[in-house]
């Protein structure tokens, strides 16, 4: 059964290769291929999640045992995010049918396959390959909207991401030149002797900036507002909700397994603080819904980086809770923005036009700000207790910034809520008031229902997250899972 | 204190020099196509760096020429990685060029700042908000020069 | 002024990187997995070219990802540049040498391309190198006669099935109870053309896919260029 894990990557790729051909033969048949493959992927992963023993396992691809071959590492954390990739791919599937739909659906399948690979892969260079695949598929999907602004945003994103991949490759070259291996578990064994020096730090910084491009890390996130404003809402939701978290997950794994220097954590902490400050202030200034959400997403990712910088993976639970919470909330908000895009002032009176959407917006906002008893409160509370327990002044500064950012967040979200609930101006006809409706409202409702369910089941969900975090934190478990019989002697 | 000029230093300096020149080119260029070309240079630099990471002076290419005792061979893994990285680079560059063609058709310019300004204007126009002053060129509300009437290409304006 | 700062910054960055990379032990890499692969690869994959056994055996999933990236780039370029191509009336036809030479070279390049693909497990070369030569062979007539068209539907057919067969060979191993992308049919005839089991098949798929992908990218760019 464990071998079937590779199918969750292989089948979407297979579907993507064949889709343009099959769509030419029969459109009616072709449109169901993508969703069917993703649904099957969900089924495989869900089955592993439910019936498995919750013990991590490793799958050697090609039958070559790591570290010589490439392995997929599946602990509960990786499985959770792989499942999220397939599920969100299904939810945000580009159903629209036109002459380009075969290509668009093929790119979406590639994006999902690459995201799954990012969650599961246990090899540094393999992660780079999947990372690039995510990037190229994203370029295509953003450019697919066909507006001039989308092309300009894509090329700017492409160049920034090109810088990122150059840096990532440079970091990989440094690591390989020093250690002679690429397997993460193998690196984790060798790191204390060989990578706890300037060279290791330089390699980490290269990888951090390189992978940080997708994780919306502070200096390399200029693409975020442009791309989210020009891409379709569904794609923005997928990118902001999932892909950024996956990039973050890779950095977290690298930090936990390979790079233990305190300087590494400090750099992340400082960049995280800068990200929170710049993101939240820009969101406060934004006059347009999607731009506001994009900047707010930068701020939220900054908070995640702060949580990640806690020493020895203590922030694991907080990172996990905040990441999942942000995944649900941002996806929901971007789906609402589908109907409510454009200037914020235009939204006056839209609560009366679509009360359900307005209610969902308030629900998401409250949880994002951290109103008890919504899940957002517990996620933020975990982080606050962890940060307050630290003695170093930099962490306390992180805590202060985080609390101030929450106030700013509340200010701009409730300002929008107030606009929505204002009565419509007299001179406007009812049909001019933007309505959120149809499929995107239903999708947002799905995320809202998930949020409410989590609120009701907060205790078991919290327990489960704690086990996942504990498992992901355990470096020895990682190494022993990948090299089962002879730990330490893997040559 | 100048280190001795060994072949080792020359190769590393080439790899890192190409990477730095490329990255500097991306940051300093004002023309989008030159930025893409700079990326190509930087990629060449890191690819050389990757090959160097597995190179041995006393070794031959990792291909068996006879059964039995083998001479020392260089590390095959970085070579495979470079092969992968080169192909990835080619794909990204081809995509970049095709997007550049479209931008040139639509905006009649490939100047980095002009494209950014027009993009911001387009985004603001779609959203119906007053334009945010561009983050990178905070010179106030500069009126955009009109797109020249005589386009470079009359046929490809809309696809 | 800004340029000067940029240059100084870049120079400083370069020196810092050089100083750091100087810490690497050049010319004597650790070769932790490298030497292990060298020792095991001939027996495990049956290929004398060890780079091939890494590309198609030990790191086959990387190769699959890379094919997907090429596919994604070609599909994206197709989305961006659109389908309709105006006829290339404006571009002048190639000269006599190019036209005649193109005609003569085409079969030769095809032969060399396929030779390199099929001997990828024995000699330097393989699917990528051969595929690029194939793409060049198909691109040459386009340079000589700008009006000529590549059959995009045929190309996308090759693209699709070549990529799919790479995965299907991998799935075949899974169906036999082995791991995904595990090499099959290894025989004990090292150095022969039919020695490396399914690896040459995989390389054939890679070569066709790379060739079709690059040919369609190039012709798309050339035809859009021609329409200007």
List where the protein language model places each region.
Chain A
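Hydrophobic alpha-helical membrane-insertion segments
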Residues: 33-49, 162-170, 361-369, 446-460
């Amino acid at each position: 059964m464990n071998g079937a894990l590779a199918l969750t990557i292989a089948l979407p790729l297979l579907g993507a290769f064949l889709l343009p051909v099959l769509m030419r033969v029969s459109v009616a048949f072709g449109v169901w291929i993508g969703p069917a493959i993703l649904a099957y992927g969900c089924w495989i992963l869900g089955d592993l999640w439910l019936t498995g023993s919750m013990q991590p396992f490793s799958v050697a691809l090609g039958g070559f045992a790591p570290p010589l071959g490439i392995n997929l590492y599946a602990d509960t954390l990786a499985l959770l995010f792989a499942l999220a990739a397939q599920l969100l791919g299904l939810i945000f599937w580009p159903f629209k049918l036109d002459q380009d739909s075969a290509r668009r659906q093929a790119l979406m399948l590639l994006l999902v396959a690459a995201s799954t690979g990012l969650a599961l892969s246990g090899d540094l260079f393999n992660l780079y390959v999947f990372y690039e695949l995510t990037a190229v598929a994203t370029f295509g999907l953003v450019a697919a909207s066909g507006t001039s602004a989308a092309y300009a945003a894509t090329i700017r994103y492409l160049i920034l991401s090109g810088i990122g991949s150059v840096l990532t490759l440079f970091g990989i070259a440094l690591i390989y030149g020093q250690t002679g291996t690429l397997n993460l578990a193998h690196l984790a064994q060798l790191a204390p002797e060989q990578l706890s020096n300037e060279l290791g730090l330089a390699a980490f910084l290269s990888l951090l900036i390189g992978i940080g491009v997708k994780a919306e890390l502070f200096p390399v996130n200029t693409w975020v507002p442009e791309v989210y404003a020009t891409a379709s809402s569904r794609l923005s939701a997928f990118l902001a909700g999932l892909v950024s978290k996956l990039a973050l997950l890779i950095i977290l794994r690298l930090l936990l397994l390979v790079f233990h220097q305190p300087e590494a954590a400090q750099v992340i902490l400082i960049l995280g603080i800068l990200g929170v400050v710049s993101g939240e202030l820009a969101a406060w200034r934004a006059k347009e819904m999607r731009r506001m959400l994009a900047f707010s997403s930068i701020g939220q990712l900054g908070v995640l980086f702060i949580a990640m910088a806690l020493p020895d993976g203590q922030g694991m639970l907080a990172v996990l809770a905040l990441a999942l919470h942000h995944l649900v909330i941002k996806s929901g908000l971007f789906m609402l923005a589908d109907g409510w895009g454009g200037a914020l002032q235009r939204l006056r009176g839209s609560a009366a036009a679509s009360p359900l959407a307005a209610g969902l917006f308030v629900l998401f906002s409250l949880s994002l700000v951290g109103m008890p008893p919504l899940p957002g409160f517990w996620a933020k509370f975990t982080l606050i207790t962890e940060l307050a327990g630290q003695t170093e002044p930099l962490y306390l500064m992180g805590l202060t910034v985080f609390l101030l950012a929450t106030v700013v967040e509340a200010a701009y979200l409730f300002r929008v809520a107030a606009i929505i609930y204002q009565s419509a101006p007299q001179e406007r006809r009812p049909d001019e008031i933007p309505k959120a409706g149809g499929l995107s409202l239903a999708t947002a409702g799905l995320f809202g229902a998930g949020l409410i369910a989590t609120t009701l089941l907060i205790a078991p969900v919290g327990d489960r997250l704690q086990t996942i975090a504990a498992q992901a934190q355990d470096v020895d478990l990682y190494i022993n899972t990948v090299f089962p019989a002879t730990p330490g002697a893997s040559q | 204190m100048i280190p001795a000029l060994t072949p080792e230093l020359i190769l590393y300096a080439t790899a890192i020099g190409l990477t730095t020149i490329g990255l500097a080119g991306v940051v300093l260029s004002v023309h989008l196509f030159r930025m893409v070309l700079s990326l190509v240079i930087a990629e060449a630099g890191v690819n050389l760096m990757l090959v160097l990471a597995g190179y041995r002076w006393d070794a031959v290419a990792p291909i068996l020429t006879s059964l039995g005792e083998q001479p020392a061979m260089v590390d095959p893994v970085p070579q495979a990685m470079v092969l992968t990285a080169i192909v990835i680079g080619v794909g990204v560059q081809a995509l970049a060029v095709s997007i550049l063609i479209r931008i040139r058709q639509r905006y009649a310019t490939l100047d980095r700042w002009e494209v950014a300004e027009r993009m911001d204007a387009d985004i603001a126009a779609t959203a119906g908000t007053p334009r945010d002053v561009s983050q990178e060129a905070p010179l106030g509300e500069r009126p955009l020069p009109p797109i020249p009437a005589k386009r470079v290409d009359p046929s490809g304006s809309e696809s | 002024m800004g340029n000067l700062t940029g240059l100084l910054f870049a120079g400083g960055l370069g020196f810092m990187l050089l100083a750091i990379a100087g810490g690497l032990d050049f010319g004597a890499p650790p070769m932790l997995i490298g030497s292990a692969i060298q020792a095991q690869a001939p027996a495990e994959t049956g290929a004398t070219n060890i780079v091939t056994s890494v590309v198609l055996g030990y790191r086959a999933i990387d190769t699959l990802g890379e094919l997907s990236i090429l596919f994604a780039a070609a599909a994206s370029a197709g989305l961006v540049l659109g389908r309709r191509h105006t006829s290339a009336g404006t571009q002048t036809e190639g000269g006599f040498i190019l036209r005649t030479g193109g005609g003569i070279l085409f079969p030769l390049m095809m032969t060399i391309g396929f030779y390199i693909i099929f001997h990828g497990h024995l000699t330097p070369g393989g699917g990528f190198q051969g595929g690029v030569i194939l793409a060049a062979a198909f691109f040459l007539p386009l340079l000589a006669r700008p009006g000529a068209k590549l059959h995009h539907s045929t190309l996308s057919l090759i693209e699709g099935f070549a990529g799919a067969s790479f995965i299907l060979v991998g799935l075949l191993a899974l169906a036999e109870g082995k791991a995904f992308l595990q090499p099959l049919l290894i025989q004990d005839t090292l150095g022969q053309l039919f020695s490396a089991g399914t690896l040459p098949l995989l390389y054939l798929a890679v070569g066709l896919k790379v060739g079709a992908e690059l040919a369609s990218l190039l012709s798309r760019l050339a035809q859009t260029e021609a329409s200007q």
